[in-house]
């Protein structure tokens, strides 16, 4: 999450209060309080914000495999099952279902208490070879010279 916040932009704005509860290979769980910024016109949690949580949650689950970058989305679908509103605490559970050579498939379930609020599937093009090359290039960069001596 530090990398998401450091980059700034939309994800950092939407999830500035996100707290990771679990991060293991292929599985990430986090929580975030619903504030007024995340509501729709009738006071419910906005579907676009929940969809973005599916996007970011799936990406974090992919990143848990050691990817420096998580590629680009090729498909995202969300089913909205129940309402939640301001003051509720949202918990998301994101899992990698399959990590193929070029595509990663994830599922993200979003809860408010015991209530399943939304569930989504997120597919990303992962370009494993490009990611490996980027990691190797970063590892081969020489350390900056120490000029303070």
Regions found by a protein language model. Give the residues of each.
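Terminal targeting signals and extreme-terminal segments of soluble enzymes
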Residues: 1-149
